[in-house]
């Protein structure tokens, strides 16, 4: 693909607006145990590396995920070696939020591990971040401490959150973060409040937003889900999507580019006998 995917900035870091999701590569399907097991069986390091390579060749170099498991680490290294391009890994570690000195030391070690792997952005995972959101006081308790640890480790702090309140409270309190995650899709899958409320919240955010689960775990077709997200976020915001095959990656990239460029996507549609009546008549 000749066209490089559009980019945005997280503080002084240039990132692709399309972000590689990792749930489907790590066995998190949000569907069933059987689906999780199938993902783990099929998403080998070699297969994931093929997908990452397609992304990198199209200028999509940004990835969102936890401290990577061995097979994902290997996949990233394979793809980087083949393309000569570097993956920007936005890492979402789980922290110990107990609040005592021992817990803080454990969190600092986790953050240092993120820095050691070369992650430019560190976003405490929703399991840590959202447990600290205080709706009564409209603050994210202790997050300023974790943000300081992240800055001291040389990374940009962010928030991986499923709560729409988190970006709001971060902005209201002047929390030192460069970006935040938010679940956002046309059908409201896993969203805690209505889609229109989250849409307005995103547009009011002071920092760029990484929208996740745009296809609602395949509950909407790629064209539908991507059209909704790309057309209702700002130019500085991002869309993070999961894939399971290199061809899916190519389709996601082409559909996204076509939507941003306002043209018809050049992808081969799935075919069944019922489509024959709407096909162009052969001359």
PLM regions: where:
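N-terminal amphipathic alpha-helix/helix-capping segment at the start of soluble metabolic enzymes
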Residues: 1-34
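Structured C-terminal cap/extension of enzyme domains
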Residues: 8-17, 36, 47-64, 80, ...
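Hydrophobic faces of well-ordered beta-strands that scaffold small-molecule active sites
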Residues: 15-22, 62-65, 87-93, 122-124, ...
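Active-site beta-loop-alpha junctions enriched in small/polar residues
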Residues: 23-25, 68, 92-98, 127-129, ...
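Short glycine-enriched, charge-decorated loop/helix-capping segments at active-site entrances
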Residues: 33-42
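Active-site beta->alpha loop and helix N-cap motifs at the rims of alpha/beta catalytic domains
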Residues: 41-137
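Active-site-adjacent beta->alpha loops and helix N-cap segments on the catalytic face
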Residues: 68-84, 101-107, 129-146, 164-169, ...
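Glycine-enriched alpha-helix->loop->beta-strand junction motifs that scaffold or abut catalytic
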Residues: 116-120, 151-153, 172-181, 204-208, ...
């Amino acid at each position: 693909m000749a066209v490089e995917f559009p980019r945005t900035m997280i503080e002084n870091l240039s990132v692709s607006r399309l972000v590689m999701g990792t749930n489907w590569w790590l066995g998190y399907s949000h569907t069933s145990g059987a689906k999780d097991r199938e993902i783990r069986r099929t998403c080998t390091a070699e297969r994931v590396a093929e997908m990452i390579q397609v992304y990198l060749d199209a200028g999509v170099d940004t990835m969102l995920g936890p401290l990577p498991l061995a097979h994902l680490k290997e996949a990233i290294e394979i793809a980087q070696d083949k393309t000569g391009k570097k993956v920007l890994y936005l890492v979402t570690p789980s922290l110990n939020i107990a609040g005592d000195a021992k817990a803080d030391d454990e969190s600092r070690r986790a953050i240092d591990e993120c820095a050691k792997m070369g992650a430019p952005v560190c976003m405490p995972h929703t399991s840590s971040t959202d447990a600290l959101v205080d709706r009564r006081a409209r603050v994210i308790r202790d997050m300023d401490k974790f943000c300081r640890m992240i800055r001291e480790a040389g990374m940009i702090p962010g928030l991986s959150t499923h709560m729409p309140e988190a970006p709001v409270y971060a902005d209201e309190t002047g929390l030192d973060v460069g970006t935040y995650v938010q679940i956002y899709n046309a059908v409201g899958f896993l969203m805690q409040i209505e889609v229109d409320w989250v849409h307005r919240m995103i547009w009011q955010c002071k920092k760029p937003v990484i929208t996740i689960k745009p296809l609602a775990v395949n509950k909407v077709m790629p064209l539908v889900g991507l059209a909704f997200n790309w057309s209702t976020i700002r130019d500085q915001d991002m869309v993070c999507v999961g894939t399971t095959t290199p061809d899916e990656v190519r389709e996601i990239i082409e559909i996204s580019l076509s939507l941003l460029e306002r043209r018809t996507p050049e992808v081969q549609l799935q075919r069944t006998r019922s489509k024959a009546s709407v096909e162009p008549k052969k001359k």
